Regions:
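N-terminal export signals
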Residues: 2-3, 8-25, 215-218
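Stable alpha-helical elements in mature extracytoplasmic
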Residues: 37-40, 52, 56, 129
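Hydrophobic pocket/interface hotspot
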Residues: 44, 55-56, 110, 133
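Short, well-ordered alpha-helical segments enriched in acidic and aromatic residues
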Residues: 50-77
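Surface-exposed, charged secondary-structure patches
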Residues: 77-130
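Periplasmic plug
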Residues: 203-211, 215
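Exposed aromatic-hydrophobic patches
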Residues: 222-228
Length: 296
């Protein structure tokens, strides 16, 4: 399954465009908020390390617990035991430099810079990592991790060593202030499947089976396990594409994949027949599952 600790890594090769001018003073980190959020994260990471379901439930947001539950069930894995089987470990905060602690409404974040160790091998080059939190009735809860790969952008690393945080103003790191709607629990799928999306120069929202699974990708590639998988018979698909302003090289493809042994098998693929400037605001189609891994 997708690891419960880490969402899809973010690649920010152009982060240097957002950096402040050399010599500009960094704003001090909110020490009080940092302390509160770090205690939540440490409690969560300890629960993950021990396989402690009670501790995991206490420190994890209700929203994330339901997202993970649906993902595990959609893979036909045992809930909640499968949550503790991920090979990625919660990175320790020791040795990392905290560059930001912020809250807005019911959302909060901690941002760090350094050699982030997920336990896969020796920590490599320095990169940023952002910890996300949601506020509930009894306090802050851990939600998810954003890991940022700077690639070869050494100018960005130099600025981050000085405490730069301008990059946190980009859309993928902003705090919405709102607690997300907790999804409804899904049922075990007839066919386990994943969605693969290529949306370059455009933004697309894909919904399956009336919104049981909903995913938006903007100027990127994406995809994850389909919530509830595919049903036997007709599966509805709604695709809402939009070309981004100023985009010249536009590509859109949506595919549904499953796994046969160690190899991925493409069950279904769609692209708009019209050129990018003539796309409809919405396309409705279907995937018909005749039997497991047999689609027409």
């Amino acid at each position: 399954m997708t690891d419960p600790i880490l969402r899809r890594p973010i690649l920010l090769g152009g982060l240097g465009l957002l950096l402040m001018r050399r010599g500009e003073a960094a704003v001090p980190v909110d020490g009080t908020l940092r302390g509160v959020l770090e205690r939540v994260y440490i409690g969560w990471s300890e629960a993950m390390r021990r396989g402690d379901l009670t501790g995991f439930s206490r420190h994890t947001s209700r929203y994330r617990q339901m997202c993970l539950r649906n993902e595990v069930v959609s893979l036909r894995q045992p809930w909640p035991r499968a949550v503790f089987r991920g090979i990625v470990q919660a990175p320790p905060l020791q040795g990392l430099t905290c560059v930001d602690a912020a809250e807005h409404g019911d959302t909060a974040r901690l941002a760090y810079f350094g050699r982030v160790d997920f336990g896969l091998d020796a920590a490599g080059v320095e990169n940023p990592v952002v910890l996300r939190f949601l506020r509930e009735a009894d306090g802050w809860k851990f939600d998810w991790i954003q890991y940022v790969n700077l690639g070869r952008d050494e100018a960005a690393r130099q600025a981050l060593r000085r405490g730069e945080r301008k990059w946190l103003e980009s859309p993928q790191f902003r705090l919405t202030g709102e607690y997300p709607e907790v999804p409804k629990p899904c049922r075990e799928p007839y066919q386990v499947a994943g969605l693969s999306v290529v949306a370059l120069g455009c933004r697309v929202t894909v919904e399956l089976n009336g919104g049981v699974h909903r995913e938006t990708v903007e100027n990127d590639t994406g995809g994850r396990v389909i919530t509830g998988g595919l049903r036997k018979g007709v599966n509805s698909v709604a695709i809402q594409p939009e070309v981004l302003a100023g985009a010249s090289d536009v590509r859109l493809q949506v595919a549904v994949l499953t796994r046969q042994g160690k190899a991925a098998k493409e069950l279904w693929k769609w692209s708009p027949s019209e050129p990018a400037g003539q796309w409809k605001p919405r396309y409705d189609t279907t995937i018909f599952v005749k039997s497991a891994a047999v689609v027409r």
